[in-house]
């Protein structure tokens, strides 16, 4: 179906998808709404029919994906799984999100979560919520005697998500090799590094034994 023949929801999604490509290619601050319209193959005014500004487009892209991630974390935490499997599932979701849509993840990382003085500040509540949910997983593992209690859950959550974000940054800027094998190893590296440092000596010895 052509852009002109698309339904209203399709046109909105068409514009959002085009915005991802434009933001990833040109950067949010360097592009104009007309660039998004051209990329989507729609009239300039149609973009404003759905979005008040390119800021609202970026907000929408971030909030849509972030909401999915928050829901995933909650669902994983609700399952009776070992903490390594829980954190592994979260790491897999984020890495696979990059694998399937690298442009979108580039936009989220570069233009939102690392933009401390602009969009990152605007969405600080949502960003903090992700850390808090991961922190709750860590606390439960501490209460079960799996993770060390002397390492604050807040720090552990930051270390976990920070490690994943640094991996994404490495791929975004071409500092790390990509491909199925590298993506799968990245998941393992994050979980092994973080959990290996958080696990009590008894748990660590049991794993080795």
Locate predicted features.
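Short, hydrophobic secondary-structure boundary micro-motifs
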Residues: 106-108, 121, 150, 176, ...
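Amphipathic alpha-helical packing segments from all-alpha helical-bundle domains
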Residues: 67-70, 74, 100, 118-144, ...
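N-terminal intrinsically disordered/low-complexity leader segments
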Residues: 1-10, 21, 202-209
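Generic hydrophobic, amphipathic alpha-helix propensity
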Residues: 11-19, 36, 61-69, 134
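Amphipathic alpha-helical linker/stalk segments
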Residues: 3, 61-89, 139
């Amino acid at each position: 179906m052509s852009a002109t023949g698309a339904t209203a929801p399709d046109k909105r999604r068409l514009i959002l998808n085009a915005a991802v490509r434009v933001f990833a290619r040109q950067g949010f601050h360097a592009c104009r709404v007309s660039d998004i319209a051209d990329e989507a193959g729609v009239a300039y005014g149609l973009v404003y029919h759905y979005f008040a500004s390119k800021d609202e487009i970026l907000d929408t892209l971030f909030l849509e994906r972030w909401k999915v991630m928050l829901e995933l974390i909650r669902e994983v935490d609700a399952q009776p799984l070992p903490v390594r499997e829980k954190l592994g599932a979260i790491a897999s979701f984020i890495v696979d999100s990059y694998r399937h849509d690298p442009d979108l993840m580039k936009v989220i990382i570069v233009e939102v979560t690392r933009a401390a003085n602009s969009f990152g500040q605007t969405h600080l509540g949502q960003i903090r919520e992700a850390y808090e949910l991961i922190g709750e997983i860590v606390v439960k593992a501490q209460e079960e005697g799996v993770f060390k209690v002397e390492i604050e859950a807040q720090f552990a959550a930051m270390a976990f998500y920070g490690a994943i974000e640094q991996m994404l940054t490495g791929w975004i800027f071409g500092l790390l090799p990509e491909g199925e094998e590298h993506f799968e190893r990245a998941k393992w590296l994050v979980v092994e590094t973080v959990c290996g440092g958080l696990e009590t000596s008894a748990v660590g010895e049991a794993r080795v034994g």
